[in-house]
């Protein structure tokens, strides 16, 4: 029995220590100088490297260790001791029937071994409570992972969107700069006024400022993504996915067609486990009325180093003990009532969440549908605005459009680009929210 206990104990310790070793910091050699990642690869990489997620994983291992402590407390326990006593030549005196008797007190060594086992209802329920705690830690870990994946997707798409807009602005800038050169040549030849060239120069500077702003936004978004990936800012990051693949109609429609199973929702699972925990706490409080049964074995061996000495302690002792609580002035009863009230509160919270989640699901589906429709419209708007701008540029080149028309077309394109980015980010956030809600 003791060999089995030692074996299980060592297995539990090895499991916790192995998990802790897996979390060791990376050496400089393990930090990549460059990374090329698709969206799914970025999410998997972040799940593996993110420190917050590592802590959540360690919390699960910690819960396993706590459960083993509870179980081990109900398994056999053994303690050994050795005591050496030196009486420094002392001789005890006893008077018996008027006669004094001297008793030598030799040095003595005492070896003692105690083995015991005790169990009660609260200990058993405590082990069940630890199981629920482990489940809750696992749910929290899964929830943290889902939140991290959603954050990675939003950050990843933000970088792609800003890069796409910057490319469009670069193309528009090239067209405007060509017009600037043509107009300035016309001014130099006396075929146009300097005002026309100056107005186009203003548009050129405006686009340059806009491009510079977008480039700084790209750097900021990329650094935010690097933080989530837990890589240094010096690491060169290349995103290999494209927006059309991530924001595909098929993906959105498939998500909207997914049936809602409340049991898959992580928030529901957490509250349900809390209600189960509250129920077990009622059982725990009720077992305060239960008995505690314990069994103990004591072995004692005394060795006298010298003459004399009396062996008055039996070498082997077996004890069986049953302890039963009798009276606590209502303390235990109040404890049971308290836990029952807490259980009722937990059930009410669970019922309320069940209703709220059904409403939240409909709202998230509405948000995704609305965001997708807006994205499609804004995507079409930016294509139309780009065509209008290209047409106005070409007309202006041949004198068929005024500076005002060119300026309006340029402003419309910039506004369309800004609105398009906002629509794109709104869509990806709505998609991530519904995926996280459905635990997909």
PLM features: residue spans?
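Periplasmic alpha-helical coiled-coil/stalk elements that build and connect Gram-negative outer-membrane
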Residues: 22, 37, 147-262, 364-367, ...
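Small/polar (Gly/Ser/Thr/Ala-rich) solvent-exposed segments
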Residues: 54, 77-95, 117-147, 269, ...
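Acidic, low-complexity, intrinsically disordered peripheral segments
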Residues: 2, 11-31, 233, 419-440
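Bacterial Sec-pathway N-terminal export signals of envelope proteins
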Residues: 12-79, 233-279, 326, 354, ...
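Transmembrane beta-barrel domains of outer membrane proteins
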Residues: 71, 114-118, 286, 323
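Hydrophobic, lipid-facing positions within transmembrane beta-strands of outer-membrane proteins
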Residues: 109-115, 316-322
